[in-house]
Amino acid sequence: MKSSSVAPRLKQERQDDCKFQEGDVNSLELRLGISSDNDQISGGGAASPWLGVGVHPWSLAARQGKAALEQAHQRPNECAVQRENRAASSAQLVGWPPVRAFRKNLSTPKPADADDLMNKVKLCSDEGHGSRCAAQERRSSSTMFVKVNLEGYAVGRKIDLKAHRSYDSLSQALQSMFHGFLSDGIATRDNELQQMEEGSKKRYVLVYEDNEGDRMLVGDVPWELFIASVKRLYIAQDPRVHAKLR
């Protein structure tokens, strides 16, 4: 009788030990929820660790990680922004020691007549022989001396065309310059011409050479155009005098 009563008692003690060990393991279990001392509910069963929170911790952590990734993508990379700013600032530095680009432009002023010079060079290349360039240079200068040659004489003179404003003024100046040459007292090689003139003054015409190398009669074009194209003056004898000799 004693042995039959001892066996159920040992079996009951073993079951109690197993339940006690399971309770210790549950108390030491790691939990992601909010900790609570009331882990046991009435009825002797272990309460679920998620009942006090109401949200599964793994889903909450997933949402938090997703939000952090979205913020990281939307936020600009500070290192990249710093590198771009540093590259932009270094690109604006010129020379050594570093000088800002706009300050370097101020320190090296552009010549005022650079555009005019480029226009003159372009005109010279377009014309080929540079006639228009020479004409522009003569207009811009304050003086314009050209050679004057009298037909039949090897020695010539020079006259400043800028000192005159009309053909009349130029004609009077040439007459005063060549007064001795144009008078009857000068000996010439053409004795027959002197006899036909019978002491009267010889008749001369004023001719000029233009920028194309042609000889033209003075007075056909306006004075400004004449100044722009003349290169040399010639005082030639009137061809009508030679016609009379024939």
From Swiss-Prot:
Disulphide bonds in the chain: none
InterPro entries assigned to the protein according to its UniProt record, in alphabetical order: AUX/IAA_dom, AUX_IAA, PB1-like
Compositional bias of kind Basic and acidic residues: 10-22
Domain PB1: 143-238
An annotated GO cellular component: nucleus
Similarity remark: Belongs to the Aux/IAA family.
Name by which UniProt lists this protein: Auxin-responsive protein IAA25
Lineage: Eukaryota, Viridiplantae, Streptophyta, Embryophyta, Tracheophyta
